[in-house]
Amino acid sequence: MASPRTRFLATLSTLALITPATAVAGPDDGKHIATNTHVDSPKSFWENNDFVLKSEFGGQEPPIADTVAWVGKGYSATDNSNQYLYTLPANGTQDYIGAPGTTYYTAPHQVSGNTSPIWLGFGADTSLPTDKFRDGVAFLDLLSVDGPGEVELFTNKDDEAGTQLHRMLGSFPDSPHSAYLVAGTHTHNSTLFTKPGRYRLTYRTSARGRDGQLIANEPQTTTIQVGGQKPKEEKTPSLKERFAQSAAGNAAAAGYSLRMAPKSNPEKDGDDKLTTISFDAKNKAQGTLTLLIDGYFLTDLPVKDGHAQWDEYMGPDPSQVQAVFTPEGDAPRWISQPLDFQPGKSSHTDSSAAADTWQETSQPRQLAPTQETELKELGYTIRMRK
């Protein structure tokens, strides 16, 4: 998990002073949405003598900055088994993530009979001029990750010998930060996230010219929404805007409550690992409930007739969840107290208590430098691994 630098948004009395850049609700509504299909992102192209990173899916090639990949729940078309959860193998090859048998939200390496929830990899266009690059290769560099948890791109099998793990990119302390590319590179890999929520991944493509000079594009950032509801096709008002437009009042009298509990009556594969998040309003207010996990956006839920509900895989680790309710009409708005969530346990808070602020966390973890380093002294160790 990240070591967050947490910024507290303005109190109710000074909310109007917040700049739009701090808004956290529906932040990717209106972008190109990559989901339930085969996706190459980032895919490296060569245009105007520079690398350009795009997302290729469904006949589209938008810039990665204009794209959000949504990793929701997905199930095999063959046997209805879930395709969004990955359990660490018993052979211990991924104990750098957690103990064998621990389960995480994951965009799958392989899908069966469909591309649900998403078939996500990265690649390079066939016109990449690798003949101009030293050794005929370029590299996709993962420069930073900003989100509620860690990320890892890999392939693996639960073989007894433990020889099938291929780590590609990631944010763990010993994760690779660069993956080689040749013209036409195309990967099928798992992309694991230790918690649900909104992740911002910053990439670049780099190579060495035959003269040894660095060739690299400016860093570009893309978004992956893990869990939550699908981002909307159209752009929507931000949380800050909705909150400023909603009414102040006596939230305690309105009778708002937020509850998290293990999902009852599991129906689909993986449901036994889900948590049901429920919001209720005794005043039957309608509006939008924004959920944040460790200060990062998780999802927006429509509140109808005083109720909203969502089943989510919260991951194996504790987290802190906060809700912000922006009702329609003259019903009072509410910011919940941060709710400490423990996997497999029930948690509850209500509007008899309210927070003056909601938390917004942003702590990009810098993984790789963008500046060249000149080695001026001895004593360095180089590690190479297959």
Show which residues each predicted segment covers.
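Hydrophobic/tyrosine-rich beta-strand signature of extracellular beta-sandwich/beta-rich modules
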Residues: 203-205, 323
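Phosphate/adenylate-binding glycine loop and adjacent helical scaffold
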Residues: 26-177, 182-185, 216-219, 225-385
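Surface-exposed loops/turns
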Residues: 195-196
